[in-house]
Structures are given as C-alpha cells and as structure tokens.
Amino acid sequence: APALPRLPALLALLGALLPGLGGAQTSVDPAEAIILRGGSVQVNCSTSCNQTSIFGLETLLTKTEVTSGDNWVLFELTDVQEDSKLICFSNCHDETMAPIDLTVYWFPERVELAPLPRWQPVGENLTMTCQVAGGAPRTNLTVVLLRGEEELSRQPAVGEPAEVTFTVAVGREDHLANFSCRTDLDLRHRGLGLFQNSSAPRQLQTFVLPETPPRLATPPIVEVGTQWSVDCTMDGVFPASEAQVHLALAEERLHSTVLYKKDSLLATANVKANPEDEGTQQLWCEVTLGDENRRWQENVTFYSFPAPNLTLSEPEVSEWTTVTVECEAPAGVVVSLSGLPSGLAVPRAQFQLNASAADNRRSFSCSAALEVAGHMLQKNQTRELHVLYGPRLDQRDCPGNWTWEEGFHQTLKCQAWGNPVPELKCHRKGDDALLPIGDLRPVKREVAGTYLCQARSPRGEITREVVINVIYHQNNILIIILVTTIVILGTVSVAAYLYNRQRKIQKYKLQKAQEAAAMKLNTPATPP
C-alpha cells in the first residue's frame, strides 16, 4: 500500500490506544473474520459518542456503505484477496479507533508428489518430496505423506511454493505400494472445517539384487555338431519375476527359458554347437533388475573330434588270405590299434595277418585320443573280420565213442564248425537210421550202433565215425520169482522135516525110558 494512507492508520491506532476525552469509544463487529479468498464480508463500525461525529472504515479494500444509523455504519468489503487489518475510527472531541483482523483462506492450487525412482533398492533410504503451491493461512496448513491410506509423516508447509521432504526406509513391503501427498488446512478452531487436498498417487517398485554374481553350469568342452545345455541360476532376487536374464555365447544371445520360484530364478538354454564356434568362446550370463545388473562368464572350448577310420582290406576272406588292418585319424589325434604292441601312439597304424579259422568273427578295435583344454578324450571304432573255411569235426566237439545206460536221459553232442555253418547229419551204418543230435531224450537199446556223422557246406564236407553203446539187462523177473518161491518152499520143508525128526527122537527116548522103569519094577529081589 502507498506510504501516505498508512500514516493516518498509524495515528488512528495510537488514538485508539489512547482514548480521548469524554470517554467515547469506537467499536467494530466482527472484531476478526476469516473468509474465502475473493469473497466478501460486512463490517459494522459504531461509536458510543452521543453527539454528531465523524467516523468511518480505514482500508485499501473495495468497500461499499450498505446502510447507516446515527452512530453506526455497515460496510461491505468485496473481492478480498489477502489478509488485512482494518480500522474503524470516529471523531468525537477526539479520534478513537477499533481494529479488525481479516484473514483470508484458500486451498492449495497444486499438490504433487515428485516423481519416484523407477526402482528403489530395499534397505536404502528414499527421500520423497511433496510440492505445494498456494494455500493459506500457512500457519494452519500441514503436508502429510501417505502410503496407501496410512499416514507416515507430516510437516508444516513453509515457503511458496512449499517443498516438503520426507525420508523413508524402503522395505520389501513397499513394493508396488502407492505413495501420495495430502495437505490439511485445519480451520476448525475458526468455526470452519478441515479441508484436504491430495496429489495423484505414485507407485514404488523395490528390489533386491545380491552382490554375488549368478552361477553358470556348463560343460567346459563341447564337441561341434552336438547339443549342449547351459543353466544360469541366482538366489535371493526380489521380485524374481521382474528380473531379466540374458545368456550369450560370444556376442550372440542364446534363446533361453526362465523359471521363477520364490526368490530364485533358473535360465536354461539348449544349443547346437556349430563348426564356426570351434575354439574357446566366452559364455556369459547377466541378470538385470531395476537399474543394476550382475554378470558372470565362463570359457567354453568347442572342438572337432571325428571317430578314427578303421578299415579292413577285405571284411570277408577265405582262410589263409592276407588281410591288412589300418586305423587313421586327423592330425593332432593319436591312435592305438589292437594287434599292435601297446605304447605306439601314432596318427596312423596298420598291420597284416594271415587269416585262419581262429580269426573268424575276430574284432579289431582302434582307439583315438585327443587332448582338449586339459581334458583327455577318447573315441573307439571296431570292425569284425569274417573268415570263410570248410567244415571241422574233431574229438573235442564230436566224441567218437559214447556209452549210455538204457532208460537214462542223454543228449548226443556233436557240433561241426565252419563258415558258412555246415549242415550236420549222423546216419547209422547198415540201416541208414538218423541219430538225433542235441535233443535230450531217454536212451533205448535200439539206438546202439556205429554212425557216420557228416558235416557239409559250400566249402566242402567232412565225415566222422561215432559209436554208441547201450547197456541193458534181460527181463528175468519170472525166473527170480520162481527161484525165490522154490527156495522158500525148500527152506520150509527142511525146517518141517528137522522139526518132526527131532520130535520123533524125543518121543522115542521117552518111550525107552518108560520101558526101562517098568522092567525094573517087575524084577524080584535077590535073597541075602
């Protein structure tokens, strides 16, 4: 306001503090008022002077006299924009004054929570700033920080615009929580209410990414042309489902599948090793969460190692044919060939043999060895030799003499050797009866005889004589029964005869004794 209008106001204030003679006083109603910015208010200025006096309202605001009486005037103030101190004055002998405090309130024009970081590490403090433009009276204006509906902290709004900061210790529970600012204009003590304005909420994302790097599980060496698998794992990641995992070989990213479980993740890639990858390559895994990442890498060596080339000059030969066995491998690979002395490690090995029947189905093997990144690798190749030879029948495989007991189960074992396998038949001399070979059956006396066993194949035939003896017993059961009966009857007859004879002897002796006794009784006594 200009300096000149303020001087009378000061003088009026002093006059009010020092009442004039006569005791007349100036009063105002209301003594204080609070209105919404841009609003209007009516002020009644009156005086206790009972004489005609001059009185009025000292203000720079737009005022209108509404009505008046002998010692009072009602003014209306309009479009009030800011706090003001008004003075009613009257001049009755002396000038007296009465002040009025006019408070303007208005709501903040802007309440905003400053942008939050896209990701915030758990365990670190985060400073949030609430920006408030406008709003009065500031002594009754408070800024509140909210998490959802929960009040975290409040501070007074200071400055224009006001920037109020809050420090929050961020935890896992704050992940995806909504934060906002609210202003509280508390005018309840002035007969009004509590006026609140809120900002738009902002969502916070928190994360945990351990300092330890991810773990790579991969074979250290891989053969080109084969499928290989690589795993990348990391524990203690929160929220694990938001983490990005990159697997790459050299500069080429690998297609991977990521599985999440609680605070752990597992990325798996199945890759085919290409020939152009041969050599040592860097395999790396990178886990990114928020604005941080962790990376680990391993060396993988890709190698080419074809199996050794094992050849036979002829895989199938006639007996006593010379066969060349040869094994060969690429440069840098050493081979060892069965049939050669051990300890000869060369890239190419061969030898010759004069094939015999004992070499039929003989297996030859070649072993190739290659060292890759400190690992000794080995591959084997085998070939089988087939030797063609005529039939063989010898004592070991076809015994020339067999003795069997009639009724027992026996098997005639007679095996012929040869390549191709010969057909074997045994016919008995005389009647050309066929002898079963290799079957378990009861022995009969009819199979006894001399047989000619003949083995035949496209490469020849051979014959061997086989004698079969059968031990058997005649059927003397009836004779045995008769003899046994006669022996029994004879024994019984002899026993009966001896018994009767003994009985007659005893009877005879008894009779003689009785006669002797009788004669002794009948003889007269001799006179003395």
From Swiss-Prot:
SMART domains: IG. The keyword Lyase does not apply. It comes from the Eukaryota. One of its GO terms (cellular component) is plasma membrane. Residues 500-528 are cytoplasmic. It is a single-pass type I membrane protein. Gene3D superfamilies: Immunoglobulins. Keywords: Cell adhesion, Disulfide bond, Glycoprotein, Immunoglobulin domain, Membrane, Phosphoprotein, Repeat, Signal, Transmembrane, Transmembrane helix, Ubl conjugation. The chain crosses the membrane at residues 477-499. Residues 1-24 form the signal peptide. The keyword Glycoprotein applies. A motif (Cell attachment site) lies at residues 147-149. Residues 38-99, 123-188, 225-292, 320-373, 407-460 form the Ig-like C2-type domain. Residues 25-476 are extracellular. GO terms for molecular function: integrin binding. GO terms for biological process: cell adhesion; cell-cell adhesion. It is found in: Membrane. Disulfide bonds join 45-88, 49-92, 130-181, 232-285, 327-366, 398-414, 414-453, 426-453. Monoubiquitinated, which is promoted by MARCH9 and leads to endocytosis. The modification Phosphothreonine is found at residue 526. Homodimer. Interacts with MUC1 and promotes cell aggregation in epithelial cells. Interacts with ARHGEF26/SGEF. Interacts (on T cell side) with CD81, CD247 and CD9 at immunological synapses between antigen-presenting cells and T cells. ICAM proteins are ligands for the leukocyte adhesion protein LFA-1 (integrin alpha-L/beta-2). During leukocyte trans-endothelial migration, ICAM1 engagement promotes the assembly of endothelial apical cups through ARHGEF26/SGEF and RHOG activation. This is Intercellular adhesion molecule 1. The lineage of its organism: Eukaryota, Metazoa, Chordata, Craniata, Vertebrata.
